[in-house]
């Protein structure tokens, strides 16, 4: 490793640590020539993901651009910025694990909608309106109707409608709840 002070190429590692949740290694080094100490980081270099836009143009995947779009859709919905960053990280990790190095904006939009559907219906509609390029009220109404139909027919909504009534009639512990996959989970 080249010393940033004297440009000498020999240094010794004094200390190594895992950082950024195991995604990088931090190394403390000392130059063997000038004795200055400096820090280096070793990170995994991912193969870039190429995004194919609606018009066919291609550009590199930009997680910060995706985050900005989600932040705009989620303003005043109560979803924390940290949660949005986690969602973007999850989407990026999913895309990195795929063997395909190209992804369409449609696929990315579907992934975002899947997450936002679980987080907040208002954020879901806002994002869908931009991503889906809504042209008028009819597009909003169709999406709202579809969202309402999915909510009514989902197992969770059926459980939540009957759970209040059942809880009043039984002696079940209020700490027992259902997770998204329908299995019991105690908090």
Curated annotation (Swiss-Prot):
Cofactor note: Binds 1 zinc ion.
Example of a GO MF term: ATP binding
Keyword Membrane: no
Residue ranges with Polar residues bias: 152-162, 170-187
Names of required cofactors: Zn(2+)
Keywords: ATP-binding, DNA-binding, Metal-binding, Nucleotide-binding, Repressor, Transcription, Transcription regulation, Zinc, Zinc-finger
Domain called ATP-cone: residue spans: 49-139
ZnF (unnamed) ranges: 3-34
Domain of life, per lineage: Bacteria
InterPro entries to which the protein is assigned, alphabetical: ATP-cone_dom, NrdR-like_N, RNR_NrdR-like
Residue ranges of the TM segments: none
GO biological process: negative regulation of DNA-templated transcription
Annotated segments matching region Disordered: 1-21, 152-187
Family from the record: Belongs to the NrdR family.
PANTHER family assigned: TRANSCRIPTIONAL REPRESSOR NRDR
Function: Negatively regulates transcription of bacterial ribonucleotide reductase nrd genes and operons by binding to NrdR-boxes.
Protein name listed in UniProt: Transcriptional repressor NrdR
Organism annotation: Crocosphaera subtropica (strain ATCC 51142 / BH68)
Lineage: Bacteria, Bacillati, Cyanobacteriota, Cyanophyceae, Oscillatoriophycideae
Gene: nrdR
